[in-house]
């Protein structure tokens, strides 16, 4: 599997967990094992989160700045 290129400002798809379906997430910061940002869809839309980087299924769009 190829490594995903996750950068601040990109939108990623977070894998579903527990009773939460997969959802889009706007990335603020990228760390070694987790990212920070805001859920864009799903029951946590508008909420801040810190999902583990292993939950990222794909990068949906690149950096939204500029």
Positions of PLM-derived features:
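Intrinsically disordered, low-complexity boundary segments flanking structured domains
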Residues: 1, 14, 40-43
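Compositionally biased, low-complexity intrinsically disordered regions
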Residues: 1, 7, 51-54
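Short coil-to-beta transition motif at edge beta-strands of beta-rich domains
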Residues: 3-17
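Short beta-strand-centered aromatic/proline hotspots
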Residues: 21-30
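Short aromatic-glycine-enriched beta-strand elements
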Residues: 34-36
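Intrinsically disordered, low-complexity, charged/polar segments
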Residues: 39-66
């Amino acid at each position: 599997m190829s490594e995903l290129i996750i950068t601040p400002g990109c939108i990623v798809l977070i894998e579903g967990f527990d009773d939460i379906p997969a959802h889009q997430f706007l990335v603020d910061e990228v760390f070694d094992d987790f990212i920070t940002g805001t859920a864009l869809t799903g029951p946590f839309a508008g909420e801040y989160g810190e999902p583990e980087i292993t939950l990222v299924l794909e990068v949906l769009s690149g950096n939204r700045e500029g």
